[in-house]
């Protein structure tokens, strides 16, 4: 079973709803347009990761500071909100008879 599938595609032509994680390293100029597209197309729980450039006017869900020579920051966003919570029930093994 493949757990990771990397694709190099145009963010503008590709439907983003097919992906759990979308990673971009763009200039600040197109970020607002990408944010609008991600909000329209991505599913709840999906992650948009922007390398080095935050989306103006949008608070990231998290920021990761990479310990490299550039002091890279990864800005993490959930455009469609968090994943829905699953209903769970408590389970415990039966005691030995």
Predicted segments with their positions:
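Sequence-level detector for tyrosine residue identity
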Residues: 8, 19, 23, 75-77
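S-adenosyl-L-methionine
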Residues: 1-18
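C-terminal substrate-binding/active-site "lid" region of AdoMet-derived donor-dependent transferases
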Residues: 29-97
């Amino acid at each position: 079973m493949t757990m990771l599938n990397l694709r190099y595609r145009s963010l503008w032509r590709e439907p983003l709803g097919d992906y759990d994680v979308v990673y971009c390293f763009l200039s600040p100029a197109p970020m607002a347009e990408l944010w609008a597209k991600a909000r329209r197309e991505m599913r709840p729980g999906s992650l948009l990761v922007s390398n080095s450039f935050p989306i103006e006017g949008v608070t990231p869900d998290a920021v990761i500071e990479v310990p490299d020579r550039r002091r890279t920051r990864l800005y993490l966003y959930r455009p469609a909100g968090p994943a829905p919570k699953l209903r769970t029930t408590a389970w415990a093994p039966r005691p030995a008879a």
